[in-house]
């Protein structure tokens, strides 16, 4: 019994140590709004996340008449000195970010699963990872952002049945475009908006320390890249058509000029004697 208890404590201690192997590298980012977070276990990177995020949080204030309530909104970003924690597993991972003396706690939960490819359901299964839950715990008694909040206290805003940033296993998700999530708050079911952009995330299967695997671009970025590339391709095709047209026209002119300069032979054979 004592051995089992010791073994259990050892496993728990190892888990705690693994959770503490985290680094906030946001100071290395060239974008002041973009954060860089790394979770490591046994000296190896197991989760990397780079993104810029902004929260739009509604809260109540008392109207001037002292009776009615007015809903205000505050915009919150993650500061450079935020504290982080994390967990890595074969099929579930987690990133926790807190700041302002624990007034804000942002949790991102990742999971890995197998999905059938194709609409007919006959294609082989492929492994993917996704964000399956996002949660923000915030305290409206924090008066830097929540000015004159009515009945201040802690609230929890969460997603329900989320399946976001679905990415093939072994690859990192990349998206410069903004991704918006709506969390439902315990504060009278208010909607908290989470806007994430300039993203690169990989919560599983990182092969090299501090290095993302092959990127998987979001549909929005692919569309924008196509929109940027398409005019260039069309311009090249149009230019090629113009060059071909001019070349054919120039060849036609030279051919006509050569034909005009040839001597005209008389059709009456009797005239050959005088030639």
UniProtKB/Swiss-Prot annotation:
Glycosylated. It is a single-pass type I membrane protein. Residues 19-228 are extracellular. InterPro entries: Lamp2-like_luminal, LAMP_CS, Lysosome-assoc_membr_glycop. One of its GO terms (cellular component) is recycling endosome membrane. Belongs to the LAMP family. It is found in: Cytoplasmic vesicle membrane; Cell membrane; Cell projection, Dendrite; Cytoplasmic vesicle, Secretory vesicle, Synaptic vesicle membrane. This is Lysosome-associated membrane glycoprotein 5. Keywords: Cell membrane, Cell projection, Cytoplasmic vesicle, Endosome, Glycoprotein, Membrane, Signal, Synapse, Transmembrane, Transmembrane helix. GO terms for biological process: establishment of protein localization to organelle. Residues 1-18 form the signal peptide. Residues 250-275 are cytoplasmic. It comes from Danio rerio (Zebrafish). Glycans are attached at residues 24, 42. It comes from the Eukaryota. Plays a role in short-term synaptic plasticity in a subset of GABAergic neurons in the brain. The chain crosses the membrane at residues 229-249. Coiled coil: none annotated.
């Amino acid at each position: 019994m004592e051995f089992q208890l010791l073994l259990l404590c050892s496993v728990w201690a190892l888990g705690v140590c693994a959770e503490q192997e985290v680094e906030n590298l946001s100071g290395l980012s060239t974008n002041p709004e973009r954060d860089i977070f790394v979770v490591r276990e046994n000296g190896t990177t197991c989760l990397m996340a780079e993104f810029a995020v902004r929260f739009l949080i509604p809260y109540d204030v008392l109207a001037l008449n002292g009776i009615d309530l007015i809903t205000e909104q505050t915009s919150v970003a993650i500061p450079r000195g935020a504290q982080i924690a994390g967990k890595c597993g074969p099929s579930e991972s987690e990133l926790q970010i807190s700041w302002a003396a624990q007034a804000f706690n942002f949790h991102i939960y990742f999971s890995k699963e197998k999905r059938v490819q194709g609409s007919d359901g006959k294609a082989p299964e492929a492994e993917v990872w996704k964000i399956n839950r996002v949660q923000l715990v915030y305290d409206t008694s924090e008066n830097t952002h929540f000015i004159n909040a009515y009945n201040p206290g802690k609230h929890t805003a969460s997603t329900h049945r989320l399946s976001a940033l679905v990415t093939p296993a072994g690859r990192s998700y990349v998206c410069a475009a903004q991704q918006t999530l709506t969390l439902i708050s315990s504060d009278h079911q208010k909607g908290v908006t989470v806007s994430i952009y300039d993203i690169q995330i990989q919560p599983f299967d990182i092969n090299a320390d501090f290095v993302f695997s092959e990127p998987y671009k979001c549909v929005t970025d692919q569309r924008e890249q196509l929109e940027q590339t398409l005019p260039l391709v069309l311009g090249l095709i149009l230019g090629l058509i113009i060059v071909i047209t001019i070349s054919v026209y120039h060849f036609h002119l030279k051919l006509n000029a050569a034909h005009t300069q040839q001597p005209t032979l008389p059709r009456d054979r009797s005239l050959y004697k005088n030639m």
